[in-house]
Amino acid sequence: ANLLEYLICLGFIDLGYSFCHASAFIRKGKTILCPGWRNVGKTNLLLSFLKDGAEFLSDDWVLIDSNGSLFSLPKRINLLHYNYRPNMDTIKKFDPILSVFSDTILQIIEGNKYKYTDLSGTQLKDSLKRRVHFEDLFKRDKVEKSENIDFIFFLNHDNAKDKVSINKCNIKNIKNRMIRILDYEQKPFKLAYDFYKFYTGKSSHLIDSARKINDNVLSEAFRDTSKVFQIDIPDQNQSELIKQHIIRIVGQ
């Protein structure tokens, strides 16, 4: 899957798009982009807004063009074990059997009752991994495109913090961090390419220029976006508090 995502990323960069690790949604006509990576509660935050009626654009990957338009990709919402408890009401409506199964598994995990099963904690958590279509989970259609980006909230995991904090941020800094996330995720493939180039003397103009193209697309896309913030998060269980901060800034 990671290799496929890398190839898809290169394909879209070749077409002039930026392929970004972020969730995105439209709330009351305002498009909100939430870049972030691992253990920041991105999916729980998204689901919380969707339950309130926000329009879905992306859970994980989003396309951005140089005009600042966001495009939804046909990728399902990825549910992990920590997404179930805060969203059990939604999951129950989607699949009552899954809600009963997940509640039982979570009780074992949360109560440290592993003696009642032969499975390890990791195996129990893995048993709750599901990819579901937004349309199936919420019984409504998603939007395919947003014409602009009104707000950017970069979700930053900071173990040194003991509470959620939010501050205005420089757009150039956010753009660079978004690109670094992609660099990190694609590091194994870029390393393999470097070895290939070294031993064969052959190179790919697209791979060599992909980072620069990505930088240029994001610079153009964000040129009119001034409402940019960083939210520092101590752990991934703060989605409701993060939501309150975002609503305070975006407006009721």
Protein language model annotation of sequence segments:
Residues 1-31:
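Extreme N-terminal, non-catalytic leader segments
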